[in-house]
Amino acid sequence: YLYDPIMCCLCMEDLKDYENMRKAMIKHRSFPGFVEDITTFMANTLIGTSDAVIPAPEKRNLTKQFMNPSCCNITERLVYTDPYTDNDHNNKIFEPNRSFFEKELYGDERLHLEVAKLKEAFLSNGQSLIHGDLHTGSIMVKQGAMMVLDPEFACYAPAGYDVGNLIANLTFAWANAETTMQEGAEKAAFRGWLEETIEKSIDLFREKSLALL
């Protein structure tokens, strides 16, 4: 995006030759170059906006610029609160799964404690300028290229939030392939790509982050 407030002009790049990554993975399509691109994005964005790289005054200005109470409230509620409470207003449960939810999510006090720790960290640890919604539905891909969209949830929070969101979505894609694809070479190749991508997402992010310090 490019916005010129003087000319009242908004320019957007044409991405018609890209496709939504989540939809592409539902079709069991793989993107071998994706892990290099996404780890570069995460390292530059997360570490590049942290105290380890930028001066404190610059970080304070960015923190102020990206104060985002309304979207942060959505994250705090939909990620860290509602999934673990018996809230049928937001939790639309497939009835055969209800007993699982009641036992494993609503009734697990140890899980509630760990989630509360994560929520407290999200509220109080402004470590990096995160994307805030870095799932595969916010990524457009084609072979050899990637674009990250939907930055409206950006704020200062723990860097691990974005990394974990990405890993979780890749894991969901693996589970989808495991349960919906016929056994054979195509399934093995797609699962293998996902497993390699998950592993490299951590290793390359660490490597590229250290290179920025």
What positions do the PLM features span?
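ATP-dependent phospho-/nucleotidyl transfer catalytic cores
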Residues: 19-44, 51-131, 142
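Short pocket-lining segment of the protein kinase catalytic domain that shapes the ATP-binding cleft
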Residues: 10-18
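Active-site activation/catalytic loop segments of kinase-like enzymes and analogous catalytic loops
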Residues: 160-213
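Conserved protein kinase catalytic/activation segment
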Residues: 139-148
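Activation segment
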Residues: 17, 146, 154-156
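Short beta-strand micro-motifs within the conserved protein kinase catalytic domain, predominantly
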Residues: 1-8
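Conserved catalytic-loop position in the HRD/HxD motif
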Residues: 133, 150
